[in-house]
């Protein structure tokens, strides 16, 4: 009751949050639902089919970097909120990091390529942002302690 003896109503709303270890798919679904959109609505907004969106949200398909960017723009959220560590590495920009780190370690492109099982030309293409480094090669970079 307030000071005049009238009953006061208190509304309690559940605070929707997402865990720090949520998958990319869980993050997409969380922010989509927060914007009151259905999966096919978001799919249409970013130009993909509904089934692909479902597969992203169910973690049945890796969501590419460019799609994460489109999703974040459609949902009006910071793109980093949707990214895992691999996509954050790609966003860094990875090309600058790879070249700088390789030089810090006094490695030639062919030396790094040999450690990763790729050609010198592929390292060069990554360093010039011609190709995006695949997720498995990112993990290999971590395994060989190239990424601190």
Residue ranges, per PLM feature:
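Helix-turn-helix/homeodomain-like alpha-helical modules used for DNA recognition
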Residues: 91-132, 136
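DNA major-groove recognition helix of helix-turn-helix/homeodomain DNA-binding modules
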Residues: 66-81, 135-148
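Short basic helix-loop element that most often maps to the first helix and adjoining turn
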Residues: 26-45, 70, 96-111, 140
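Conserved hydrophobic/aromatic packing and binding residues within compact polymer-binding modules
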Residues: 28, 42-43, 53-56, 82, ...
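A short, Lys/Arg-rich alpha-helix, primarily the initiator
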Residues: 5-34, 84-104
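Recognition helix of helix-turn-helix/homeodomain-like DNA-binding domains
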Residues: 47-62, 87, 118-132
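Primarily N-terminal secretory
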Residues: 2-12, 45, 73, 80
């Amino acid at each position: 009751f307030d000071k005049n003896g009238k009953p006061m109503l208190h509304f309690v709303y559940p605070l929707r949050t997402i865990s720090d270890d949520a998958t990319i798919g869980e993050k997409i679904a969380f922010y989509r639902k927060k914007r009151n959109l259905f999966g096919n609505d978001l799919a249409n907004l970013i130009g993909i089919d509904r089934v692909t969106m479902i597969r992203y949200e169910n973690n049945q398909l890796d969501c590419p970097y460019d799609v994460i960017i489109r999703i974040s723009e459609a949902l009006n959220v910071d793109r980093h909120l949707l990214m895992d560590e691999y996509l954050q590495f790609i966003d860094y920009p990875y090309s600058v990091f790879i070249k700088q780190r390789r030089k810090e370690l006094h490695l030639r492109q062919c030396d790094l390529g040999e450690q990763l099982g790729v050609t010198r030309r592929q390292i060069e293409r990554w360093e010039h942002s011609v190709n995006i480094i695949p997720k498995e090669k990112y993990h290999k970079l971590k395994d060989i302690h190239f990424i601190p």
